[in-house]
Structure formats: C-alpha cells, structure tokens
C-alpha cells in the first residue's frame, strides 16, 4: 500500500571462505526504466548471535541477582538486522560453508505512485565477486491511514542503554541515544511509556539494573521524594516519543520490597500491600505524586500499573489510590497485566491486559472478551493482550519471525485494542554477541539491539521479529480500513475469524523450541501456510 512497510528475506551461500561482504540495493525503477520516487529499499545483513533458550521458569524463592546463564546448550540465531557491511569475523562458517541471511525492508510514502517496480540487491565480496537478486515491488492504489490507533506497549528499560553506552542516565547524551532507540517503537505504533517509581519493580529479573526514577528518602520519620530522573524521562517520552500514557511500576512490585534511604543509610524493607508500613509509605508517596503531576500537567497521562499481582494486593492498591484524588476529585488511572478474569476488578482498571493463553484456552471465551472490549472502549478504557515466556507461537530469537505476525493477528481476532510485551530493550551484558537469560527464552528480554559502542552516533538495530510484528500491525490497520467499506466489511471479519490458535504440547526445554510449547511439524506447516495466506489477503 501507499504509506506502508513490508519485508522480504534472502540468503547468501558461499562454498569457500570469503573476506568482508558488502550489500547494495540499487535504485528502484518503474516499468519504463525511470527512477521511482516514494519507495525506499533497505537491504541489510543479519548478524548471528549466540542464544540460550533457558529453563522457562523462575524458581521460588529466587535470588535477587540473576545467576549466570549456563555455558553449554547454545545455538545461533540471525536475530540482528545489522547493516550493509559484514566483516569476516562476523560471518558464521559451518562445514566449510558460509550462510549469511539478508533482511530487506521496503517502505512507501503516502504519495508513492501505484505500479510495478523493481530493483536489484547485490552482494560483493572483498575479492571482487558479485551476485544479485531481482526484487519486484507492486504498489497498490490504496493508502494506509496515517492515524495509527493501534496500542502497542513494549516495556522500556532506559537504564540498560545508559549502562551499555556508559553515559549518565537521562543526561543530554543519553536522551539523544534514546531518541534514535525509540524511533522504531514510535513508528510501529508505540503508545505507552514505561517508568519506575520503586527500585527494581520486577525484583531484578534482568541482567541490567532498573533503579527507581523517583528517589525515596525518610528523614526524621518524614518521607521525601525526588523526581529529577522521572521528570526528564517523562518529558522525553511525551515530547519526543509522543506516547499517550506512561505506566508507572509499581505500587505492588514483585517481591513487595521497598528500598529507600533513611538518615543516610540504605534501607530494604518488606512492604506487604495493606500492611501498616505499606499504607504509611504509599500514602505519603501518592499525596506527593498527585501534587507533582498536577504541577507538571501530567496527571491524566499517568497510569499506576501492576504486573501479574494477586487479586488481594491489587484491591489494596486500588482502594488506597482512590483516597488521593486530584483537585477535581479524579483518581489516578490504574492498569494491570492480569492472569484471570474478574469482572469487579476489571471494571476498576483503566487498562486491562490478560495473557494470550486465557483466550486460547477459553478461560475467557472470545465472545465474552469481545463484548468486554466493546463496553470498555465505550467507557474510554483500553484492553490489550500480552504474550510471555513458554508461548508457542512465540516472539523469541529461535522463533520463526512469522510467529510474531501470527501473534498480532490472533490478538486482533480477539478484538483487543493492542498488544503488550516485556520487553523492548532489557539488554544483557553483550547483546550484539549473545542474548542469553538464565531462565527465559533467548530474545524474550528485548526486540531491538544497540549500536556498536565505537560508532559516533550509535543507532538502534531491530530484529526480524520486530519487523514482522510491525508488518502485522500494518496488516491489522489495513483490515480496520477495509471494515469501513461495506463491501469488504464481512470479508475482513471472516479473515480474522479464520485465524486459529496454535498451541503445542508441553516440553521442559530445548534450544530451538519456544519454552514449554513445542508444536509438531504439522502445526508448524499449518502456521506457515496461514501466515502466508493472511499476509497475501490484503492484495
């Protein structure tokens, strides 16, 4: 379509050792041989990285700091769309052959002229050898609406990039890096920002630290709060990334541990929701936070978020938050990634996000969920679906990138407003070399990669998984446009109704599988056929 983006893939196979490789995308030409306008083709090598699938479970109790990932049982995944130059040492050689994947992205502007176009993708070796492939592009006389109403929510870890590039968190240099790093998220439809209001909201489940953007202090029995980093990050998200809302984690963090400074000492204290200490501490915070947000004009943009917390803890938080309204009597918005359906709880939440399995396993019947979404939408509330570890299809390094597309289509078939996933950029120590996690599937922690530290202006590198996620969001937006045309409304709905749920049988672990869910070969073939069928249906 016009104003669209699509993807293609290729491979270079070399029977003998090569030196550095170079990739060139020739100018795009129309059928008359004239240079086209409004069509951009990017061809980039994919970089192989070491992956480890993990055990796909978190032991309880677990240590605050993650253990090292096991050294063995690793594989390789071409998960980084790296660039047009590939140095010899980055090539992967096996049995005397080099297999080098290529990712091709085609973007069209709103005023690209409909028609058939072509270009050549050329690969050169340092010795002067060259091979090429012809790429044909058909631009349809259809415009993709520029208004992107899809609610994509990929949790961000800005401290990870500050640590990777060794810059001051939220300083000028860091925010310049983050501006480039968040561009793919914004272009894909990212609508939600992520902020921390306590130390390690997820009990340090990543290699990188996630400190609190709000500094908690208690001096002479009185609570004090410093918002410097929170303000710089919030201002950046609202101005540069143009998010609609910012989720603040969390009134009920994993582990229910509150860390703060008291009389010059670092204190770590258990704070069970509803307890006397928890109520005292969070009452002080909420009173301060509401006042601060009103002064900054941000009150309506904030969501106090909770992630997979028990019903009793969420109720305690909701009850306390309601006692600290703004000057107009409005309470802060509250949201949550929830495991089970509870009508009373869901009615109190501005954002509700059940796990994909709740729909797939019919714990929440699809028709009921669609009705809930419609009702909540009329009330101005948001309803999304999230995926996580052990899902098949999944969005991991060892997953077929098409599984990311299926995920978006399946969620759309359920009627949700959007998709949530942990995480966008929770990098490990050396993400351009390996993306391991001791517990989770490789790639679950991030969908984008950093630039090389030696680069003058390091730019983010995305994964094929991210590109297919983005392409599927474009497909969903096209279907939404088609529904507005009477003659296509029923066809669009039938197409979405045809999306089936593919879940495999349980398996504890194994490189190349998606956690507990491993599909048999028939399901894999059927999924591949469905991805192709739905992807072509828009033509």
Task: Report residues per predicted region.
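Substrate-binding cleft of secreted/luminal carbohydrate-active enzymes
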Residues: 395, 400-446
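Active-site clefts of carbohydrate-active enzymes
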Residues: 376-406
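Short, solvent-exposed loop/turn segments enriched in Ser/Thr/Gly
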Residues: 3-9, 100, 112-120
């Amino acid at each position: 379509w016009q104003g669209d983006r699509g993807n293609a893939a290729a491979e270079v196979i070399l029977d003998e050792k090569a030196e550095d490789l170079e990739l060139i995308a020739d100018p795009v030409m129309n059928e008359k041989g004239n240079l086209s306008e409004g069509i951009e083709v990017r061809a980039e090598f994919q970089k192989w990285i070491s992956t480890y699938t993990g055990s796909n479970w978190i032991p309880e109790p677990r240590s605050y700091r993650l253990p090292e990932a096991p050294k063995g049982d690793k594989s390789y995944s071409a998960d980084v769309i790296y660039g047009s130059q590939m140095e010899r040492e980055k090539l992967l050689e096996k049995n005397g052959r080099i297999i080098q994947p290529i990712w091709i992205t085609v973007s069209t502007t709103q005023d690209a002229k409909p028609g058939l176009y072509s270009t050549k993708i050329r690969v050169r070796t340092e010795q002067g050898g060259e091979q090429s492939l012809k790429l044909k592009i058909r631009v349809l006389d259809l415009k993709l609406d520029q208004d992107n109403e899809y609610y994509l929510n990929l949790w961000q870890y800005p401290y990870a990039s500050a640590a990777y590039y060794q810059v001051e968190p939220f300083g000028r240099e860091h925010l310049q890096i983050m501006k480039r790093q968040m561009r793919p998220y914004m272009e894909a439809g990212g609508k939600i920002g992520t902020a921390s209001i306590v130390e390690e909201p997820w009990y340090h489940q990543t290699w990188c630290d996630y400190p609190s953007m709000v500094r908690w202090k208690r001096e002479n029995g009185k609570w004090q709060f410093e918002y410097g980093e929170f303000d710089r990050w919030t201002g950046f998200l609202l101005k540069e990334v143009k998010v609609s809302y910012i989720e603040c984690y969390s009134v009920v963090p994993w582990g229910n541990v509150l860390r703060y400074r008291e009389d010059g000492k670092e204190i770590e204290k258990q704070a069970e929701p509803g307890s006397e200490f928890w109520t005292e501490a969070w009452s002080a915070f909420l009173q301060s936070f509401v006042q601060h947000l009103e002064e900054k004009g941000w009150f309506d943009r904030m969501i106090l978020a909770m992630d997979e917390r028990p019903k009793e803890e969420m109720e305690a938080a909701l009850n306390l938050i309601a006692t600290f309204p703004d000057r107009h009597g409005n309470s802060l918005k509250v949201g949550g990634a929830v495991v089970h359906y509870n009508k009373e709880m869901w009615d109190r939440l501005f954002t509700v996000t059940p796990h994909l399995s709740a729909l797939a396993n019919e714990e929440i019947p699809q028709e009921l969920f669609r009705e809930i979404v419609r009702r909540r939408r009329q009330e101005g509330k948001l309803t999304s679906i999230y995926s996580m570890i052990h899902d098949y299809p999944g969005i991991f390094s060892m997953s077929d990138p098409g599984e990311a597309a299926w995920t978006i289509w399946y969620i759309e078939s359920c009627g949700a407003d959007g998709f949530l996933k942990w995480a966008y950029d929770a990098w490990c120590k050396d993400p351009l070399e390996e993306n391991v996690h001791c517990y989770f599937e490789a790639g679950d922690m991030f969908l984008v990669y950093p630039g090389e530290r030696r680069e003058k202006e390091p730019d983010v590198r995305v994964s094929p998984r991210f590109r297919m996620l983005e392409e599927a969001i474009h497909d969903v937006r096209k279907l939404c446009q088609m529904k507005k045309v009477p003659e296509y409304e029923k066809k669009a709905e039938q197409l979405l109704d045809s999306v089936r749920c593919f879940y495999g049988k349980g398996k504890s672990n194994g490189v190349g599988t998606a956690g507990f869910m491993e599909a048999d070969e028939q399901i894999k073939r059927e999924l591949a056929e469905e991805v192709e069928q739905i992807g072509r249906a828009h033509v």
